Amino acid sequence: MNDMTLYLIIALVPLAGSLIAGLFGNKIGRAGAHTVTILGVAVSAVLSAYVLWGFIDGSRAKSDENVYTWLTMGGLDFSVGFLVDTMTAMMMVVVTGVSLMVHIYTIGYMHDEKVGYQRFFSYISLFTFSMLMLIMSNNFIQLFFGWEAVGLVSYLLIGFYFKRPSATFANLKAFLINRVGDFGFLLGIGLVLAYFGGSLRYQDVFAYLPNVQTATIQLFPGVEWSLITVTCLLLFVGAMGKSAQFPLHVWLPDSMEGPTPISALIHAATMVTAGLFMVSRMSPIYEMSSTALSVIMVIGAITALFMGFLGVIQNDIKRVVAYSTLSQLGYMTVALGASAYSVAMFHVMTHAFFKALLFLAAGSAIIGMHHDQDMRHMGNLKKYMPITWLTMLIGNLSLIGTPFFSGFYSKDSIIEAAKYSTLPGSGFAYFAVLASVFVTAFYAFRQYFMVFHGEEKWRNLPEHHDDHHGEEHHGLGKNDNPHESPLVVTLPLILLAIPSVIIGYVAIEPMLYGDFFKDVIFVNADAHPTMHIMKEEFHGALAMVSHSLHSPVLYLAIAGVLSAWLLYVKLPHLPARIAQAFRPIYVLFENKYYLDALYFNVFAKGTRALGNFFWKVGDTAIIDNGIVNGSAKLVGAIAAQVRKAQTGFIYTYAAAMVFGVLVLIGMTFWGLFR
């Protein structure tokens, strides 16, 4: 089997499973649908691991080939091809591995779903295929198709419960916000096609870069901008939409309207990592624009800190994890801005495992609570759900960067990258990610203590407290006890907990300080020496652990955990008093900085009002009543006046003839004596 055949199988097997489950779901039944899709993703995952191992042991080389050309237009070829190197192989394993866990978990989570079971499995396999096509692409056009495909399938999955108004609003919101980002992304691709040698293949674009290094473009008359900077920023606008960076982040928390398994897949391994992967893949372009890198770093820092603040006040267990995703995506974006692309991709990998674990553990707790998602109704679940408790604890310890857990190595590396960066804005970025350490630890363990410790709060609730939480809005009765989830739910938790602990220790040496990304990621060490400094300062996992003992990061995390314990275990009455004392800030956080209100009332309603204006004034008044109907009325009015001259009396016609003759005589004399 040659390489291209292998890569085609990896990409197409999930698509085949999706089509079978989607088109023949009624014939093969629920068991047939989940069997065929799980089998497809499992084959893809095993083969992806085989590909990655080939790069690790040196038996596999980078591959960049076109599979076929599907359109030729004006000398430009639009091809489907695969670029498979170490970064691609790592992402293939992450995407298919997490997707496999989500597929297995879904059997238990969606067990009681009366309709849409086969449809859901079809969607998540299609999601996996779309992401694989995105990360394996060797050209911008295929990248864009994969980019749009994950956006489309996320729309279908977020709105899976399409009879629920909040779900249809959420998926439309996600779709429209991403269209804003995708418009910028498409403009960036257009500039690449127009100015970077007339090719959309990555290797051709990168080879042409020296020819446009000093090129400028006029966005406005008389104002020259660096062509590369404008291209980088437009491409990054696309990344801001897909990877939910401020201010295009507002769709991500609402994606919780979809079932929990898809929340894990979107937030951990697929859609939100697409933008980060794209920027890392385009590192040769971004390294030529320090301005673009500074903008990226500052936006990432804003997202990391200010989205973390919003996680502090959430009461929905899934939304806490969602805001942690936003904050962690901000961390990764800071790393990209610091030219630490390998660090960003390292955190993409570690984050995928512990974030999928956190979402699926949250889903297990939701199952135990009979689909009540409000943490204020939980408490002491540790007693009833020990596997869920332990795996959630592992996920949170990795999230906050506890030494020896996977998240520690990647998260601390990002903080160090911001510290050593010399770009404008790096000081703010370092402060933001440092402050976010405390905030992350606080909201992560606030969630942990509210759910797994303290009083069993559901026993003090009215019998019907299922007003707006959960997928089916049930909730435990006063005398009910939660039960541990079945093996099909807990097994993925256990399997995801393993890399959440060890993958950082195993991978940090080759990915950050070795040559794992050699000839894949390009860094201009003279202009952006961050990684060079880090390689001199640290020499592996144990050196980072030793360094953490002298760093404020560890102590900020400990302070965050202790603060959460104090407020939600020892003094549970205090948070309400603090919220009341700082009411304006609480209201600001509760309204999410009023960005949703701004977008809805200004942009959405403003666009609708503008549309109504053009409809009523432009279309109805001017075109319909003015030009179309008005011209008909004008002709009718003229005809009516002309008709009055048709009297039927001969003397009227004789007078008209005399008048006409006089006019002709007058014109003749005018011509003779002029």
Show the residue positions of the predicted features.
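N-terminal signal-anchor/start-transfer transmembrane helix
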Residues: 11-26, 100, 240, 244
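Aromatic-capped, Gly/Pro-kinked transmembrane alpha-helices
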Residues: 75, 80-83, 509-555, 565-674
